[in-house]
Structures are given as structure tokens and as C-alpha cells.
Swiss-Prot record:
PANTHER family per the UniProt record, alphabetical: CYTOCHROME B_B6 PROTEIN-RELATED, HEME EXPORTER PROTEIN C
Gene Ontology terms for molecular function: heme binding
Record's signal peptide: none
Family matches, as InterPro entries: Cyt_c_assembly (IPR002541), Cyt_c_biogenesis_CcsA (IPR017562), Cyt_c_biogenesis_CcsA/CcmC (IPR045062)
Chief localization: membrane
Alphabetized Pfam families for the sequence: Cytochrom_C_asm (PF01578)
Family: Belongs to the CcmF/CycK/Ccl1/NrfE/CcsA family.
Subcellular location per the Swiss-Prot or TrEMBL entry: Cellular thylakoid membrane
Function comment: Required during biogenesis of c-type cytochromes (cytochrome c6 and cytochrome f) at the step of heme attachment.
KW Transmembrane (keyword) present: yes
Protein name (database record): Cytochrome c biogenesis protein CcsA
Organism name: Parasynechococcus marenigrum (strain WH8102)
Length: 305
């Protein structure tokens, strides 16, 4: 493939970093002043556009889907996180969402741009094991699931920091109900009436985190299954207890426990939010920790000799 100037790809990432760096304090200012977040959404949307352009140019330059090393996967994760944030804000354009979610996209692109050595930022030919159509199916789905789970977990963290003295009363009937929950009351004529009660800030965040984590969990399941099929084709085994595989399974179990406590135990508010925050830590270990150790078949490699 024809080579692009390397600073063009990294420059787009740096531009996205600057936009998100500007958006973050504006988001926190909007929270404190209860201002609208239109400018923050615009900055995040522009950052997502730059990240999209960066990934497309990297794809054109390298000749393969740009998710083959730690730098590319971090840029892809930043893109997925900003996109998830924009989609969540369409459901509830609150400055709290922007303040909770923007740090994740900013952290990913900052780590990719400033923490990785130049060798890891360079495009390189795919190793034979990655020259498969499963690369897009498995890795991209896993990364998008991480983005949804990370954003959802950050919203759960926001639940822990808001409405701390108020009992949350979110019910399944309020999921996707436009910020209202349904409640029965007895009217003056003695007839039961259905009334809509606006959700509190904590309940809105709880609803959004639940929905976002549910989507992320389903995608993580698809990603793990597709990875097992690909592993069998490439290495002759569906599961080898590679460190990344093991931590991905732990991640799946944590979020399965989160959904179980909500669906079967009726937990809501702060208790499942604590489980989601544990999931946040597990994803960090699974994604970054394994690469820092530089071990396993799934490691992108941190040490280069």
C-alpha cells in the first residue's frame, strides 16, 4: 500500500486529544452550573470524526483493518468510547454523562499518543495468525463491547457520586421510558390510576448504565464466541486459558453477575453500580495489564527487545 506521512495519522489523533481535553473541563463546568452541553457534544463529535479519519487513513496506509497493535486498538477504543458517549447523550443530554464518559476517550487517545514507544505506533504487516476475516469480526466486536462496558461502568460510578442520600426506585418499566417511571395511585373516585413520575438524576444514570452495559455484555459474548472459533482455526483449540482469555472470561462473569443481580435479585442503584465499578477494574487489567506484562498469544507487546 502507498505510505502516508506518519505525522498525518498521529496528528489526527493529537487533534482528537486536544478536542477532548477542551471538552472535559467544559463538561465539569456544565455540571456545576447546570448549563447545556451542546458545545461539549460538538467537541466530542469532532473528536470522533478525527478519530474516524485517523483509522481510515491508517487502514489505507497499512492495508489491513487498523486494530493489529496496541496503538491502533487504543485509537479504535477511543473512537468507540466517543461514539458510545454520543449515543448515550442522545437518550439523555445531561452534562453528567459528558463529565463521566469523556475521560475514557481522552485517556485512551492520550495513552496511545504519548505513552507508547514509537515502534508500537508504527504500522507493520500483519503476522500470519492475524491474516483472517475473523480479525474484524472478533477484535472489533470485543473493542466495541469494551467501550460500551467502560462507559456504562463510568455512569455507574456517577450513580455512586450522585443522590447519595436518596433511595433509587428504578423499575424495569422505566427502562427506555424517556426519563419517567410508572406508578399506580388511587384516584379520588377510588379507581386505580397510572401516573408518570420523572426519574431523579441517579435513576436516570442507573437506567442509562444498565442499558449500556447490557449492550456491551451481549457484544462481549459475541466477541468471545467468535474468538473461540478463530482460535480453533488458527491454533487448533477453542480455549487455551491464555491470560487474555482468562481475564476476558472474568470480565464476562463480573458483568453477568451485574445483570443477574438486577434481573433476578431486583438490585438497583448503588449495589449493582459497585459491581459495575469492579468490572471497570477488570477490563483495565484484561486490556492493559496483560499487554504491560507482554505475555500470552493475545499480547500486543509492550517490550520490544
Amino acid at each position: 500500500m502507498q505510505s502516508l506521512p506518519f505525522d498525518l495519522v498521529t496528528g489526527l489523533g493529537f487533534g482528537a486529544f486536544l478536542l477532548l481535553l477542551l471538552a472535559l473541563p467544559l463538561a465539569f463546568w456544565a455540571v456545576s452550573s447546570q448549563a447545556r452541553t451542546g458545545i461539549v457534544q460538538l467537541l466530542v463529535a469532532l473528536a470522533n470524526l478525527l478519530l474516524t479519519s485517523q483509522l481510515v487513513l491508517r487502514w489505507w496506509e497499512s492495508g489491513h483493518f487498523p486494530i493489529s497493535n496496541l496503538y491502533e486498538s487504543l485509537c479504535f477504543l477511543a473512537w468507540a468510547c466517543t461514539l458510545t458517549q454520543l449515543l448515550v447523550e442522545r437518550s439523555w443530554p445531561s452534562p453528567i454523562v459528558a463529565a463521566a464518559a469523556t475521560p475514557m476517550g481522552l485517556g485512551c487517545i492520550a495513552f496511545a499518543s504519548f505513552a507508547l514507544p514509537d515502534q508500537l505506533q508504527s504500522a507493520a504487516p500483519l503476522v500470519p495468525a492475524l491474516r483472517s476475516s475473523w480479525l474484524v469480526m472478533h477484535v472489533s466486536v470485543i473493542m466495541v463491547s469494551y467501550a460500551a462496558l467502560l462507559v456504562g461502568s463510568l455512569l455507574s460510578l456517577a450513580v455512586l457520586l450522585t443522590d447519595r442520600g436518596e433511595a433509587l426506585e428504578l423499575r424495569s418499566s422505566s427502562i427506555g421510558s424517556g426519563g419517567f417511571r410508572q406508578s399506580m395511585r388511587v384516584g379520588s373516585d377510588g379507581v386505580l390510576q397510572l401516573q408518570s413520575i420523572r426519574l431523579s438524576t441517579g435513576e436516570q444514570l442507573d437506567s442509562l448504565s444498565y442499558r449500556t452495559i447490557t449492550v456491551g455484555f451481549l457484544m462481549l459474548t459475541v466477541g468471545i464466541v467468535s474468538g473461540a472459533v478463530w482460535a480453533n482455526e488458527a491454533w487448533g483449540s477453542y480455549w487455551s486459558w491464555d491470560p487474555k482469555e482468562t481475564w476476558a472470561l472474568i470480565c464476562w462473569l463480573v458483568y453477568a453477575a451485574y445483570l443477574h443481580t438486577r434481573l433476578s435479585r431486583g438490585w438497583q442503584g448503588r449495589r449493582p453500580a459497585l459491581v459495575a465499578v469492579v468490572g471497570l477494574v477488570v477490563i483495565a487489567v484484561c486490556y492493559i495489564g496483560v499487554n504491560l506484562l507482554g505475555i500470552g498469544l493475545h499480547s500486543y507487546g509492550w517490550f520490544l527487545g
